């Protein structure tokens, strides 16, 4: 996602611990390899050293089964799978997210490579809107629309699928923490 380098080093310093945790979730779902994924898990769960050493391979298998494939995904990380009548990638929901991004001057830098409604992009958007909402009613309104009109409609079902299908304690803990994070996000929107 890009808004002329909206997350420069100075804004990272201004992020709350809540927002930093949101970016750690983004990084976990966007990680390209086991090492990066384990690093994200360690940020989310400092006590996860054991997972890094003992369960790293199992977590990787679990991650792939849940979110990547090659078999049918157990917990697809795309909003369109949960919201569209036909659970397809790059469907109406993806285009709706793209339009929402454009309406606030943002876009996904790898458009058509990874669908705009991938959980990692949506986590980043929620964090960006949250960070800016502290200073701008315009961003608070956008955050409210995004959370209540979009995330709330699919993220709980996604988390339930993770809980129901995960094989490792790391993934089950991730689902629990994502639930807590999302509950706090909704509280911030309502206030």
Language-model features: locations:
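Surface/interface-facing alpha-helical segments and adjacent flexible terminal/loop regions used
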Residues: 1-191
